[in-house]
Amino acid sequence: VPFTGDKRIFTADLFYDTQNKERADIYRQYIWNVLDATADAPNVYQSVSEEYTGPAHFVEFWLDCIASWQQKTGRKARVVLNTTHDVALSVMSKPSYAALVDIVEIEQWYYHGRKLYAPEGGKNLAPRQHLRLTRTTNPDFADIYQTVSEAVAAFPGKAVLYYAKAF
């Protein structure tokens, strides 16, 4: 049964199931359509989602679709990776995927009080739900500096963006 005692229904596993051929074909067509529509716009960067908290395998599927589109069309997509910390580390540790990413955006992990807030991907929780569980404090400048510095070191050669409502 895909729900818990509080009656939340979890459908993310179905959504992110790229082993389902029909669903994977629909996703691939959608991704390619978006790439076709925006490829000539130099100010457009592709992102898997604004608040992506899904699993790494779906991001890899998305990047595989981008790579196959680039190979078929000879065009270059500009890609920003906006995921949870564990998913970003997993994806960027694979050279073929890291080569596709132009920018790593930090929105869903950060230091606060020198402790890392980094919810795991694929846990059926939106960013706001993760925050309610942990009740973190707002990061100060030193926390942000540490977060960005570590990302720059972890992802050499990539632009790093940091987003937070407080700054």
Model region roles, listed by residue range:
Residues 1-92, 96-103, 135, 156:
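Active-site mouth of glycoside hydrolases
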Residues 95-167:
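Catalytic-core region of carbohydrate-active enzymes that cleave or remodel glycosidic bonds
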